[in-house]
Design a protein with these regions (language model features):
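Conserved catalytic or regulatory cores that recognize and/or transform ribose-phosphate-containing ligands
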Residues: 1-138
Length: 138
């Protein structure tokens, strides 16, 4: 079963809106078999200059669209620097609310999947024993 993962990371204040990190993450996740939702591919880049310039109404609209996309994902993938981004924090809260798995860019997803598989689980098994996003706060 192919799982859908949403990439979340800081954009404002980053060189080229952090495009390189988003696209590298997309390639890496595609190679691991995920269906990837990269917000840069969904029109956010079209409006990014206005968002960076401070168009609050447009930013709110984009965030609503992103929250709707996260609802349809199994996981969220947090790029480095996510803790400094209020937008990413909001996306994370949304993902936790929809019981998405949380992966960090610094995390070895394959190793995590193998470890959980050996324990008779997958990262997608939720039995209420673990809190989604546990360990994200480190």
């Amino acid at each position: 079963m192919k799982h859908t993962i949403y990439i979340a990371g800081p954009m404002r204040g980053k060189e080229n809106n952090n495009e390189t990190a988003f696209h590298n993450a997309e390639k890496r996740l595609n190679r691991r078999g995920f269906t990837v939702i990269n917000p840069l591919n969904i029109g956010r880049s079209i409006a990014s200059d206005e968002i960076i310039a401070g168009n609050a109404d447009l930013l709110k609209t984009v965030m609503k669209i992103e929250r709707m996309l996260i609802r349809h994902c199994d996981a969220i993938y947090l790029l480095e620097g996510w803790k400094e981004s209020d937008g990413v924090k909001a996306e994370l809260v949304t993902a936790i609310g929809f019981d998405c798995m949380i992966f960090l860019e610094s995390e070895d997803i394959e190793a995590r999947q193998e470890k959980e598989h050996k324990n008779g689980r997958t990262p997608w098994d939720h039995d209420g024993a673990e809190t989604p996003g546990a360990g994200v706060h480190s």
